[in-house]
């Protein structure tokens, strides 16, 4: 099996997002950084790291609408890992959760996240598709 740039990029995205989420959880838990800030870091990472990583690997994942739709679905469904019984059984998930669990959102933190992810991807996917139809590249620069 050949490790294409798309596969390498997908693995790098998973590792990068996991690292960011563990780091923001540690900032909130051990260094008392306000969750409002760590949550923003997580949101930025979730929506912008994939674009940056694709550019580093010269991957074409952002031109493939099906790949994008599946990635958005998997990312949104991955929030299931943050349900309380799972978090209690797997401590790293609890640490990651603490990076975006604002006190004012409790006990509805996951509901808020589901809606934010769904709304974000509902806007992003059609825009990316439209830009692709127009021949415009998605770029950070």
Where do the PLM segments sit?
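Interhelical loop and helix-boundary elements at the membrane-water interface
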Residues: 2-16, 23-67, 76-141
